[in-house]
């Protein structure tokens, strides 16, 4: 009897450890990956831009191709729609400020809107969008771009972190 209690206690601790590990994670994925409707350009042709040093908060040189695309996607994800007139009026997304704190079904809803906004603004560069995940103060967007053999996983840190 004591051995059964000991095994049950060990099992309970293991399950609790797994639950604690995934407690602050949220994940959204469509039934079918979101696909671009038109032709997709090679990611290496993405326009050049200034490189933003995220740690020093300054511009430092130029970047192009995949690196430029990733930086652009990160800025799009954290920029509230219409906040900065230097960009197009629809640049950014409505969930930029709230998705990092959204939980449960609200995270699912906001992820769907963000995925639609990403596909709308980057449809000429993204072949498929697979998922959006959140862990603590970070978003992880997994997508497929032309010119890269594997999927691209973009990590986006909350601006308030």
Positions of predicted regions on the chain:
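Immediate N-terminus of the mature polypeptide
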Residues: 1-106, 137-142, 146-161
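Periplasmic polypeptide-binding modules associated with outer-membrane biogenesis and secretion
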Residues: 109-150
